Amino acid sequence: MRNARVLPAVLFAIAPLYAHGATTAYRIDPVHSQVVFNVEHNGFSRSFGRLKVTEGTVRFDPDDWSKSSVDATIDLASVDMGDAEWNKAVRGASLLDSDRAKTARYVSDSVEKKSDDDGIVHGKLTLRGKTLPLDLPFRVNRIGKTIYGLHTVAGFSSTVTLDRAAYGMTSNKNSIGNDVSVWLEIEAIRGGDAQTRSDKETPDAPAQ
């Protein structure tokens, strides 16, 4: 009988801890996260580029998405267009201006659930010194252990269109399109799960 009385008391005491811990913090993994973008090139084709997500935190509550959040930093100097001269031009003052503002940052204001796997992050993007509202539709791909069980990972995908002129990138209007299609692939490691060099993909090691 004593145990019957003690058990409810213990459960009552620890319940707030579980409730508080429902929102899990994940550290963005720069090895497996990236931003890919493309823009029209003089009507002939769409040119593709890539940027590195250097750091950030995703907080995600699978039971209440409204408690979730994201804060991510993108290295503008990391832009890769597949050509050294083109990289230099895109980093220049008329476009990304990475010498003056080396990073872009996205910070959420709220997260809205739309379906079992899809939602929208309402937030703001700071780029080239301008901070503007930006909503990111996203999909939760998977949350779980890596195949080797090294850590727990949350994976997300998002696509959005940016108006480059809104951020002051108004040059080359006749040759470069204004609307930039952006594709984000994010993997984030649960807080407390350490990432080691062995976690990273190498030519001799499979993806984890």
Question: What role is predicted for each listed range?
Answer:
Residues 8-16:
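Bacterial N-terminal signal peptides
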